[in-house]
Amino acid sequence: MELLDVDGAWLYTPEIMRDERGEFLEWFRGRTFQEKIGHPLSLAQANCSVSRKAFCAASTSPTPPPGQAKYVTCASGTVLDVVVDVRRGSPTFGRWAAVRLDAARHQGLYLAEGLGHAFMALTDDATVVYLCSQPYVAEAERAVDPLDPAIGIEWPTDIDIVPVGEGTPTHRPWRRPRRPGILPDYEGVPGALHRGGGRRGTGP
């Protein structure tokens, strides 16, 4: 597993065995995960999202503290998956990292509790599957506008992006929700174990 430029975000690249019958891989290994992260992934919910090309969704901490850790993979098509550090007090607060997840490499992306998550479908029928450490709580969701220039995510310029949730009460500009009580705090988050460095705005 490779530590990305956002603290608490890791990328796993599985070994894929291919022959005339097809292919086989392990897109998640509990032992490898625990050795790198320092604790097991608690599984409370598994989600599957199928999106048309150009649709983009983002959320920050969709459960009460400490938040919801996620382990994400793309089962079909291709997505640009983005991690944003929205945890107050984090050494990488405000930074983002983006990776292309697709059905060819079958990589897995881990996001620690409290990290913001956004993805954009680069193909039709892009299928994202993710394991969650806590159940989703709709009334606790806090979404940040993924297209806000204050964050500066470098989305593809050759696709007309269709943001999901734009204009809803929880879909805030980036600067507004920095006050206490809206964004999650870094201290006490179980996933805040590896304090990586990095640059603001790391692209794929």
From Swiss-Prot:
Q: Identify the EC number(s).
A: 5.1.3.-
Q: Which Gene3D superfamilies match?
A: Jelly Rolls
Keywords for this entry?
Answer: Antibiotic biosynthesis, Isomerase
GO MF annotations in UniProt: dTDP-4-dehydrorhamnose 3,5-epimerase activity
Pathway assigned in UniProt: Antibiotic biosynthesis
The question of whether Isomerase is a record keyword is answered with yes
Binding annotation for substrate: 21, 26, 45-47, 70, 117, 141
Where are the stretches annotated Disordered? 164-204
Q: Does the keyword Nucleus apply?
A: no
- Give the source's domain of life in one word: Bacteria
Top enzyme class, one word, equals isomerase
Supply the InterPro entries for this chain.
RmlC-like, RmlC-like_jellyroll, RmlC_Cupin_sf
Can you cite an annotated GO cellular component? Answer: cytosol
* UniProt-annotated catalytic positions: 130
The residues annotated as site (Participates in a stacking interaction with the thymidine ring of dTDP-4-oxo-6-deoxyglucose) are 136
Q: Which GO terms describe its biological process?
A: antibiotic biosynthetic process; dTDP-rhamnose biosynthetic process; polysaccharide biosynthetic process
Q: What PANTHER family does this protein's entry cite? A: DTDP-6-DEOXY-D-GLUCOSE-3,5 EPIMERASE, THYMIDINE DIPHOSPHO-4-KETO-RHAMNOSE 3,5-EPIMERASE
Task performed by this protein:
Involved in the biosynthesis of one of the two 2,6-deoxysugars, dTDP-L-oleandrose, attached to the macrolactone ring oleandolide to produce the aglycone antibiotic oleandomycin. Probably catalyzes the conversion of dTDP-4-keto-2,6-dideoxy-alpha-D-glucose to dTDP-4-keto-2,6-dideoxy-beta-L-galactose.
Q: What's the family?
A: Belongs to the dTDP-4-dehydrorhamnose 3,5-epimerase family.
Name of this protein: Probable dTDP-4-oxo-2,6-dideoxy-D-glucose 3,5-epimerase
What is the species of this protein? Streptomyces antibioticus
